[in-house]
A protein has these predicted regions:
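The serine-hydrolase catalytic nucleophile loop
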Residues: 35-47, 191
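The alpha/beta-hydrolase serine catalytic core
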Residues: 16, 111, 116-237
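Short beta-strand element of the alpha/beta-hydrolase
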Residues: 25-33
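N-terminal cap/lid segment of alpha/beta-hydrolase-fold proteins
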Residues: 1-22
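Gly/Ala-rich beta-loop-alpha elbow adjacent to hydrolase catalytic centers
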Residues: 98-106
Length: 237
């Protein structure tokens, strides 16, 4: 399952680092969650899925994570969305898979550039987290995550998060969409995925509620890939 490293240089000396596998289109693109990195259990499973189908695959560390530049808590969500679009411009129309914060970023990127997203899979997407970010912070301004490091959230990041138009987002998503959420997720409530799915403006959409599924959803990854591949792309939004 060999992949090759790549780097995308950004303005002001920033950069994104990832790895990719050459293969047939559409490529699978994976966006990880907050405090995570590109090389995780789900992305490894998706890479294996891509290899068995001789399809392209790409994953990258979002800024503030892993080998990419920036510090956690210092990069705005709007910047992460712009970065994701830059990556998709590299691959062309892709099957975009986002987990948690990566799901939120993927949804915004798909809404902004539907021409670059053939299908969209959102795994426990972090809807509701950003508009209410100040409620999540401690008095010291730190965000305490369930499975990652605690970190200070810069004022510009808070302001950007609160300004995101999340309420109108579902209606702007006009691509085939799979939303997956577990009933035992103690990080992001199931209700936000139900709300998002109901508003998606494409006829080919599915909400899969995983009984006893946690926030990571690692145990059902193989079925997730099957379901996103099964989404119909030849129907009108």
């Amino acid at each position: 399952m060999a992949t090759s490293l790549f780097r995308i240089d950004l303005p002001e000396g920033h950069h994104i680092v990832g790895d990719e596998r050459a293969g047939d289109d559409p490529c699978y693109v994976f966006l990880h969650g907050l405090g995570s990195v590109r090389a995780g259990e789900k992305s490894a499973s998706l890479l294996d899925h891509a290899q068995h189908r001789d399809r392209g695959f790409l994953r990258f560390d979002m800024r503030g994570h892993g080998e990419s530049s920036g510090e956690l808590g210092q990069v705005t969500v709007s910047e992460l969305i712009d970065d994701a679009i830059r990556v998709l411009e590299r691959t062309g129309p892709a099957v975009v898979v986002g987990s948690s914060l990566g799901g939120l970023v993927a949804a915004h990127a798909a809404a902004a550039r539907p021409d670059l997203c053939e299908r969209l899979a959102l795994l426990a997407p972090a809807f509701g987290l950003m508009p209410n970010i100040r409620r999540q912070l401690g008095q010291d301004g730190f965000l305490h995550t369930s499975d990652g490091p605690s970190f200070f959230v810069a004022p510009r990041v808070r302001d950007d998060a609160e300004a995101l138009d999340e309420r109108g987002l579902p209606a702007r998503v006009r691509v085939p969409t799979l939303v997956v959420h577990g009933t035992a997720d103690d990080t992001i409530p199931l209700q936000v995925s139900e709300w998002f799915h109901a508003g998606v403006a494409h006829a080919s959409k599915e909400l899969w509620v995983v009984a006893d599924g946690d926030h990571r959803l690692n145990t059902v990854a193989t079925e997730i890939w099957r379901r996103v591949d099964a989404l119909t792309t030849d129907v009108k939004p």
